[in-house]
Design a protein with these regions (language model features):
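Interhelical loop and helix-boundary elements at the membrane-water interface
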Residues: 1-31, 43-190
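N-terminal, motif-rich segments that launch catalysis or mediate targeting to/interaction with membranes
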Residues: 32-39
């Protein structure tokens, strides 16, 4: 089970890191077309049982189908390329490494959300990575800007982690980027 979940999440991390930077060399329209194509490829691969690494999971999930949907939503709602990048990096890094570390190191300390097992290690991993991503974006805007907007560095990672926890069956792949985009869109990012 560990090998399958870790392999699946490594694909999640790798693809997400690549996709996060699409706006810097593709148009929004091209990104949206790629998301629809990505969705269709995953749907067909489920039916034909190809790409076993992303489908090899014992629990019920629609995460692999909702991953491109979350990216599509981010592309539709993000006010800037940076907002899109940070939202998708939450899927790739925060969610991906939370699952990897939670699977490997989180067996001893866990809790349940809607009868789904979540690990303390995974949630802390998500929070730390989210804090670093949001903190970096806010700091990039300048020190006076960062001081004025420190609230988002504190609250947005907590809200995103909450959404990751309640987003069962893979719905976190839509909820997390939606919350991150909404939170960062409230800021006037350069």
């Amino acid at each position: 089970h560990v090998r399958g979940e870790v392999g699946r999440k490594l694909v999640h991390v790798t693809v997400g890191m690549y996709v996060a930077f699409w706006p810097y060399f593709m148009s929004w329209q091209e990104i949206r077309v790629m998301c629809v194509a990505f969705f269709l490829v995953v749907l067909v691969s489920q039916r034909l049982n190809t790409f076993k690494a992303i489908h090899e999971v014992k629990r019920k999930t629609h995460g692999e189908l909702l991953f491109p949907v979350g990216i599509l939503i981010a592309s539709l709602l993000a006010s800037t390329e940076l907002v899109f990048t940070v939202a998708v990096l939450h899927l790739a890094l925060a969610d991906g490494f939370a699952a990897i570390f939670g699977t490997i190191y989180g067996e001893r300390r866990h809790y349940r959300v809607f009868s789904y097992k979540k690990s303390v290690v995974g949630t802390i991993t998500f929070l730390v990575i989210s804090f670093l991503l949001i903190g970096y974006v806010v700091l990039m805007q300048g020190s006076s800007y960062a001081l004025a907007n420190i609230w988002i560095v504190i609250w947005l990672p907590l809200i995103a982690a909450f959404m990751e926890n309640v987003g069962v069956l893979g719905t976190d792949n839509v909820l997390v980027p939606l919350v991150v985009v909404a939170g960062l869109n409230t800021l006037q990012l350069i």
